[in-house]
């Protein structure tokens, strides 16, 4: 059983079989530090996940695992190279990651570990090469808000900086302190936005 491991931009080969480890991860389900992918067919889409994990607290992708936790296995070795393309070509700056393959019931599962980056934001390039920064909230990759971008920009300054928010942004942040979750309707009402134009 040959497995490939990508550390930074170096590819190494090692053997590893650990059904119990993968089953434990799968039993946790998808959450803020873990996402399942049935397959990798688009490097740009994977770049969004890499951006989200790198901009938040890091995490892992399990490739060859369906959303319901069923292990389907990776279909081809090309998926490892698509991950590398996502990290180096479609993430700016490039994302350092570690990839390990595991054999589970004769099927191959890829584990991709992404560390939180120091130099935020990490952008994912879309089909027109426009950069978009993502963050991870619960089990979803969400576009970073202008507030996030402003905070990251100011955090790069060595002396620190005071970040000011608009009245709408402050109301939204205050509401999020009280409640962990807000619906779109609640956000629109708090910020006095028209629901139709927001969507």
Mark where each language-model region is:
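Single conserved hydrophobic/aromatic residue that forms the stacking wall/gate
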Residues: 1-13
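Conserved N-terminal catalytic/coupling substructures associated with nucleotide/phosphate chemistry
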Residues: 14-199
């Amino acid at each position: 059983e040959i497995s490939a491991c990508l550390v930074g931009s170096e590819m190494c080969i090692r053997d590893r079989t650990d059904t119990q480890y993968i089953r434990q991860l799968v039993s946790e389900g998808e959450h803020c530090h873990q996402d399942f992918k049935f397959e990798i067919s688009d490097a740009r889409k994977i770049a969004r996940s890499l951006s989200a994990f790198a901009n938040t607290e890091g995490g892992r992708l399990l490739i060859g695992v369906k959303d319901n936790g069923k292990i389907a296995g990776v279909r081809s070795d090309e998926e490892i190279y698509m991950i590398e393309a996502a990290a180096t070509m479609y993430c700016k700056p490039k994302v350092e990651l570690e990839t390990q393959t595991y054999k589970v019931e004769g099927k191959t599962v890829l584990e991709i570990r992404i560390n939180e980056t120091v130099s935020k934001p990490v952008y994912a390039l879309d089909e027109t090469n426009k950069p978009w920064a993502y963050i991870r909230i619960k089990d979803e990759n969400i576009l970073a808000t202008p507030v996030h971008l402003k905070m990251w920009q100011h955090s790069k300054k060595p002396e620190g900086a005071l970040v000011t928010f608009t009245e709408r942004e402050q109301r939204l942040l205050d509401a999020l302190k009280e409640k962990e979750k807000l619906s779109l309707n609640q956000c629109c009402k708090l910020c006095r936005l028209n629901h139709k134009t927001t969507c």
